């Protein structure tokens, strides 16, 4: 930053700017916020403003640009949405009364995590600011808040990966750290698009000391202290709406890592990156902003407590049984504004008259909502009824004080009702009488002078004036009119009578506006005292809203109440993918069963591409998530256990940021499942091993299946194109083969989308290529090659996986962060002679070329090592690491 001290004002600017070097400084000058120097150059580009200069005659003129103060919020939003900070510097005294330089201070630092003006587009989204600290024990403290609602939660988390997963789940834009957080983790967070801010010293505030009352460990007190201090320092205003910190345990909810949430398209469509086409989109029939935010929170954290799940189910069932009452409830909820964020604006001091009318309107719906819930006559809603506090004293106070349609700004006056305050009424009478007197004076002066177009007006510079066109100036008396302003075609004058009346009117206006603002602040403080009650009411209404949303979608899409079982039996009858069904229409969707009893843990799924294998897998995961949210599910009947975790590997996506290949990402996601899954988990693996050479992939796929079967025992859906693996059902007793049906009709492939028992008999790959529109000659050539390959396979026994010749795996530039512990895997696996013949002892990888090139010494060495490898005695991660080493040797 080029420091400029040509004037006292620029010296003041630079002194303030030095305190906020990483932020745009919006420096108030009159009716504009100005930016100077580098801020102006960059800001003009980002905000599409005209770049000008200050001190044109100077040797080095100062770049500057500005935005009008009345429109400043929109410009702040643009910068913050792009990941910048904005320091708002205000004039702290009236420039007219200032002696010397006007005093200025930064009144707020707006950052991605502290932005509270979310607008309509963000009404149903939380904006979380997160803090992170590290204890000597290696455990992380994590706390987050949404400043617009006052929500504040904290947790202790072990491991960097778990921390990153939690941050991504929260979709946090900004993380506040202290010195305990290592630079490596800071860089990983930055790579994920999070702004890193620092806050080392903790400051205590008596106003909000209550937030730590329920914290029982030093780690949690430390991280909440860091978070609250940062908010206090940057926002510089009341935070009375911050709620007591709630300690939560991530293990108390169904765990899904970020990859699984992404693969399942819970809240963001993989293709469009938008809400449409997601499970959240399907389930969202909420009528309030609060309900919309709570729905997403429930979706992010499904329950694992059976009693809590069944309590939600019971309330959804009750709402389903009462159609008319449910409709009445929806009509009432539509009239409820965002109580949480209204309460936040009250605490911040940014609430206006229209906000208070919205609050009043919302509170007036509560008695109607109470009546509707009472009409249900369902005991499961007793707690809800007890929490429906209408906060009638606040509603009454607003109704008595505020006009029904107040102006946007309190400073403009006209917000307080007539009759509310006697002194205010007197000032207003003086103003009204004065304006009546002005109208009478105008008529009188026209009559006396004979000037019909004479008029009385007002502006902020000259006050009240009498305006006469120049052609009529000769008609004015010479002794009564005092010239005030000359215009092109007219002159403006004053008279002694007009001056006196102007003084009285302006004095009344000034006192009226000041008194009105004082009365408004008193009302705001009265509402502020009820913030806790308003927040509790908001929570009850939000919960009601989500439950009625569940009831609506359950009725509209013919969902059923799932039965939760204590064992491991899973039985979904005629299950459906809810989002695909909504897009296609119910008549076009083919439902399928999923049956896995206590003796079946793995379904090995085969079938052609595009036949619906991935959809089948996703629909089971979505059914589980919906059930554990408390919603009904898309099926004719459903029985299921309560799952503790869901792991998925569906689809292929390179991690370009960290330089990891598709295969490495695939192995890492698979490893997370193998490392952390329990017998109560659900695993979905789609085409594991396809990212590497054929036999490498097949070997890994088989080893992973065996590992899950023999060690993990989780319910698993595993789709594959390796048809040799279907023979595993002979040795793995808890594995069953199923396939997606397809038939050939007149040379064309017809997908049945129906899951059938047993393995698929063909892969139909060339048929799928035909459906994709591949050239006819290419398809004909593929048929010839396929025939040759099949004949070669029939004539040559295939080599065992331990002796197979395979190409090295794709490059992987980063090591796996956590690994499956290999503790005598061979001891837990079946003996080699008892294994399925999925990979026989003499198989060799087929070549599309008749003449194989001569091997280099390095290639020959790798081939020798492959032939000596004992695949059955290795973990999946050990295999992957060995393949990675070979790849490094072959690419040198």
Swiss-Prot record:
InterPro entries: DNA_mismatch_repair_MutS (IPR005748), DNA_mismatch_repair_MutS-lik_N (IPR007695), DNA_mismatch_repair_MutS/MSH (IPR017261), DNA_mismatch_repair_MutS_C (IPR000432), DNA_mismatch_repair_MutS_clamp (IPR007861), DNA_mismatch_repair_MutS_core (IPR007696), DNA_mismatch_repair_MutS_N (IPR016151), DNA_mismatch_repair_MutS_sf (IPR036187). ATP binds at residues 607-614. It holds the Pfam family MutS_V. One of its GO terms (molecular function) is ATP-dependent DNA damage sensor activity. Keywords: ATP-binding, DNA damage, DNA repair, DNA-binding, Nucleotide-binding. Residues 796-830 have a biased composition (Low complexity). One of its GO terms (biological process) is mismatch repair. Belongs to the DNA mismatch repair MutS family. This protein is involved in the repair of mismatches in DNA. It is possible that it carries out the mismatch recognition step. This protein has a weak ATPase activity. HAMAP family: MutS. This is DNA mismatch repair protein MutS. It comes from Levilactobacillus brevis (strain ATCC 367 / BCRC 12310 / CIP 105137 / JCM 1170 / LMG 11437 / NCIMB 947 / NCTC 947) (Lactobacillus brevis). The lineage of its organism: Bacteria, Bacillati, Bacillota, Bacilli, Lactobacillales. The gene is mutS.
């Amino acid at each position: 930053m080029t420091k400029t001290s040509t004037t006292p004002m620029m010296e003041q600017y630079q002194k303030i700017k030095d305190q906020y070097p990483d932020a745009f400084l919006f420096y108030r000058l009159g009716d504009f916020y100005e930016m100077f120097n580098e801020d102006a150059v960059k800001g003009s580009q980002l905000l599409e403003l005209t770049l000008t200069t200050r001190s044109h005659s100077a040797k080095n003129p100062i770049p500057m640009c500005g935005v009008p103060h009345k429109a400043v919020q929109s410009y702040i939003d643009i910068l913050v949405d792009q990941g910048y900070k904005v320091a708002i510097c205000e004039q702290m005294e009236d420039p007219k009364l200032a002696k010397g330089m006007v005093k200025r201070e930064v009144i707020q630092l707006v950052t991605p995590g502290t932005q509270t003006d979310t607008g309509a587009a963000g009404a149903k989204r939380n904006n979380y600011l997160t803090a992170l600290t590290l204890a000597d024990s290696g455990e992380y403290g994590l706390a987050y808040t949404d400043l617009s609602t006052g929500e504040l939660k904290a947790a202790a988390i072990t491991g960097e990966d778990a921390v990153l997963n939690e941050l991504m789940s929260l979709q946090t834009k900004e993380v506040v750290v202290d010195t305990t957080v290592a630079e490596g983790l800071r860089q990983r967070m930055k790579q994920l698009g999070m702004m890193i801010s620092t806050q080392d010293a903790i400051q205590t505030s008596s106003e909000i000391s209550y937030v730590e009352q329920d914290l029982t460990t030093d780690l949690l007190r430390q991280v909440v202290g860091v978070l609250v201090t940062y908010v206090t320092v940057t926002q510089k205003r009341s935070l009375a709406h911050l709620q007591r910190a709630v300690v939560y345990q991530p293990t108390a909810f169904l765990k899904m890592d970020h990859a699984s949430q992404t693969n399942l398209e819970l809240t963001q469509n993989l293709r469009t990156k938008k809400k449409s086409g997601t499970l959240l989109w399907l389930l969202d029939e909420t009528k309030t902003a609060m309900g919309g935010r709570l729905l997403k929170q429930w979706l992010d954290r499904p329950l694992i407590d059976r009693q809590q799940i069944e309590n939600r189910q019971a309330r959804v069932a009750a709402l389903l049984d009462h159609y008319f009452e449910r409709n009445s409830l929806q009509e009432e909820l539509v009239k409820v504004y965002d109580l949480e964020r209204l309460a936040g604006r009250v605490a911040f001091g940014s609430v206006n008259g229209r906000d208070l009318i919205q609050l009043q309107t919302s509170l007036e719906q509560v008695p109607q909502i109470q009546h509707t819930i009472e009409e249900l006559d369902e005991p499961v809603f007793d707690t809800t009824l007890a929490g429906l506090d209408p906060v009638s004293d606040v509603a009454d106070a607003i109704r008595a004080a505020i006009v029904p349609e107040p102006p946007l700004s309190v400073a403009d006056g006209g917000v307080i009702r007539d009759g509310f305050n006697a002194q205010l009424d007197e000032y207003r009478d003086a103003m009204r009488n004065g304006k009546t007197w002005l109208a009478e004076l105008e008529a009188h002066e026209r009559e006396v002078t004979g000037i019909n177009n004479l008029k009385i007006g007002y502006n902020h510079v000259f006050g009240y004036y009498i305006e006469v066109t120049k052609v009529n100036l000769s008609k004015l008396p010479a002794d009564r009119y005092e010239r005030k302003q000359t215009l092109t075609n007219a002159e403006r004058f004053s008279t002694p009578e007009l001056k006196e009346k102007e003084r009285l009117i302006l004095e009344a206006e000034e006192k009226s506006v000041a008194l009105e603002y004082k009365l408004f602040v008193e009302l705001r403080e009265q509402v502020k005292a009820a913030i806790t009650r308003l927040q509790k009411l908001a929570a009850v209404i939000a919960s009601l809203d989500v439950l009625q949303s569940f009831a609506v979608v359950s009725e509209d899409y013919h969902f059923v109440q799932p039965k939760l079982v204590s064992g491991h039996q899973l039985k979904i009858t005629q299950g459906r993918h809810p989002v695909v069904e909504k897009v296609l229409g119910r008549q076009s969707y083919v439902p399928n069963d999923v049956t896995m009893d206590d003796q079946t843990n793995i379904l090995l799924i085969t079938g052609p591409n595009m036949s619906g294998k991935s959809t089948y897998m996703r629909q089971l995961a979505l059914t589980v998530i919906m059930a554990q949210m408390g919603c009904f599910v898309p099926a004719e009947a459903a029985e299921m256990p309560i799952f503790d975790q869901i792991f998925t590997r569906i689809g292929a996506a390179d991690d370009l940021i960290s330089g990891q290949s598709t295969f490495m990402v695939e192995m890492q996601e698979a490893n997370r499942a193998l490392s952390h899954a329990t017998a109560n988990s659900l695993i979905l693996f789609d085409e594991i091993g396809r990212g590497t050479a054929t036999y490498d992939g097949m070997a890994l796929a088989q080893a992973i299946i065996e590992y899950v079967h023999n060690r993990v025992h989780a319910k698993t859906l595993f789709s594959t194109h390796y048809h040799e693996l279907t023979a595993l059902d002979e040795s793995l007793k808890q594995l069953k083969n199923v396939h997606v049906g397809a038939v050939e009709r007149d040379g064309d492939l017809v997908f049945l989308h129906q899951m059938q028992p047993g393995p698929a008999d063909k892969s139909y790959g060339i048929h799928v290529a035909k459906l994709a529109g591949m050239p006819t000659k290419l398809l004909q050539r593929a048929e010839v090659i396929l025939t040759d390959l099949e004949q070669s396979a029939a004539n040559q026994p295939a080599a065992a996986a331990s002796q197979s010749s395979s190409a090295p795996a794709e490059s992987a530039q980063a090591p796996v962060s956590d690994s499956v512990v290999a503790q005598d895997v061979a001891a837990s696996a079946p003996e080699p002679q008892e294994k399925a013949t999925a990979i026989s002892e003499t198989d060799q990888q087929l070549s599309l070329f008749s003449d194989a090139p001569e091997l280099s010494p390095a290639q020959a060495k790798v081939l020798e090592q492959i032939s000596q490898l004992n695949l059955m005695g290795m973990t999946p991660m050990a295999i992957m690491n060995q393949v990675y080493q070979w790849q490094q040797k072959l690419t040198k």
